[in-house]
Amino acid sequence: MPKGYFLSAHRSPANPEKRQAYLELAGPAMIKAGGQMLASTSSVDAYENGVTEQTVLIEFESFEKAKAAYNSEDYQAALKALDGGADRDIRIFEGKWFYIKWVIISDLTFCHRF
């Protein structure tokens, strides 16, 4: 089964007090819902309309569990604590992987996706 992912990218600096209140609730809410923090950083190179603020990536067992984590009472309480203290872009998506087979013919290398 494909994994589910929660991606949060801040579009503007957060209000420090509201951000702290949010963080105290959001992390435990995501862990309680089965999330595993893969990355969290403010060291971001943004391209094509991206913004270089805090970015967080959390992995879940499935797309459905990632959506359930966002909609959980615990995470909604964290959002209430944030109370508009940050402009964020939230994405929940299903991770679909593909395999790459390299084919070498003479001196040429080809990549075949399947």
Language-model-detected regions and their locations in the chain:
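Short S/T/G/P-rich N-terminal loop/turn motif that feeds into the first structured element of a domain
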Residues: 1-54, 61-67, 71, 94-104, ...
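C-terminal structural segments of small proteins and small subunits
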Residues: 67-71, 76-91
